[in-house]
């Protein structure tokens, strides 16, 4: 009888150990699966947690804010106006007061916030890149990629060329995945209602 009880208790103990091991194994497998999934996502987006985060990184290192974000002037120089993030040349900003003919013949002139440029091509204004309808709100991903690959405004075949200083000739070498990430980020930021002025032809054409 005593041996039977001992055998029974040993059996219960073994079952308990097996159940515990099984639970721990399942938990370990779940954790491993989760870790592998997170690693896979980060690998897909080059170490970032999402396509949007990767796109934000590309926008920052690409210097897009240099021209597309208006600035506030301070005693330390211009600083980015975070309320107008990537919204382009402000519609209500006065034009640069210069002798355009002389500037276009000799070089270029730039507004203090770097959103207006005057040169041999005429006057160009930094575009609104926010998801507002006055910016990229109605753009498709395909249009965005076409614009950057071909230097064509609004990504519509037959439209005017993208004007300087937009460095699309270099940006065109980004991969499709990089461009898609940038577009995803731009679609995620705060929309800003800002109708950027249309470019102005050079004086040589006007006259």
Please annotate each region the language model reported.
Residues 19-22:
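C-terminal motif of bacterial Sec signal peptides marking the signal peptidase cleavage site
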Residues 24-26:
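Bacterial signal peptide processing site
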Residues 34-60, 74-76, 138:
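Electrostatic cytochrome c docking/interface patches
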Residues 52, 159, 165-167, 181-184, ...:
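Interaction-mediating elements
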Residues 55, 61-71, 144, 182, ...:
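The canonical Cys-X-X-Cys-His
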Residues 138-153, 168-197:
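C-terminal capping alpha-helices of c-type cytochrome domains
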């Amino acid at each position: 009888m005593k041996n039977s009880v001992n055998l029974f208790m040993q059996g219960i103990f073994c079952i308990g150990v097996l159940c515990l091991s099984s639970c721990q194994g399942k938990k370990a497998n779940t954790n491993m699966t989760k870790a592998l999934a997170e690693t896979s996502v980060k690998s897909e987006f080059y170490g970032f947690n999402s396509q949007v985060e990767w796109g934000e990184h590309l926008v920052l290192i690409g210097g897009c804010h240099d021209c597309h974000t208006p600035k506030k002037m301070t005693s330390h120089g211009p600083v980015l106006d975070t309320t107008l993030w990537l919204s382009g040349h402000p519609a209500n900003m006065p034009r640069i007061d210069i002798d355009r003919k002389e500037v276009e013949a000799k070089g270029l002139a730039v507004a203090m916030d770097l959103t207006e440029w005057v040169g041999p091509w005429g006057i160009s204004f930094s575009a609104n890149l926010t998801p507002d309808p006055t910016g990229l709100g109605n753009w498709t991903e395909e249009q965005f990629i076409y614009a950057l690959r071909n230097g064509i405004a609004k990504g519509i075949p037959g439209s005017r060329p993208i004007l300087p200083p937009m460095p699309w000739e270099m940006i065109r070498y980004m991969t499709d995945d990089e461009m898609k990430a940038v577009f995803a980020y731009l679609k995620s930021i705060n929309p800003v209602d800002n109708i950027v002025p249309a470019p102005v032809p050079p004086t040589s054409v006007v006259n």
